[in-house]
Every structure is written in C-alpha cells, then in structure tokens.
C-alpha cells in the first residue's frame, strides 16, 4: 500500500523521508535509521499522532537517548504544544 502522505524533512543535518501509511502490528511509528525513513500509522487520532511524530523526531535527533527518555519527552512536548493550541 502506498503512503498516504510523504514529506522530506531535515533533522540533525540528515534528510529523512517521513511517511504516513498503514502499519501492521502494534507500533504506531517506526524510525529506520539505515534507510533515513520514518513511518507513522496514518489512522491515529490527532493527539496520538502528534506524540508519535515527536517521539520519532526525538529518535532522529538524539539516537543515543533511551526509549524511556524519548517516550517521556514526546509525551511532555505533546502536552505543552496541545495546551498552547498547536493542532494538525
């Protein structure tokens, strides 16, 4: 199935292909470092999508950060941005 939306973004000096597509399994997002690609499930509710976007962006920016730190940081940033009125 082709991605529903694809973007080219630059994070930490690298270009990434950011794709919204149907994902199988339980993960809402994947960051493929060797392919410079991020895949995000295309059917997520807005707040969850924002958090997954932030989560995967943090993986791209800080690859040595622990999964727990990435998860906590993404959740905290999503709460702040949502409170400030940022929406998709």
Residue ranges and their predicted role:
Residues 51-60:
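Active-site recognition of the HExxH zinc-binding catalytic motif
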Residues 84-88:
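Short, charged, intrinsically disordered terminal tails
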Residues 2-47, 62-63, 67-81:
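Active-site scaffold of zinc-dependent metalloenzymes
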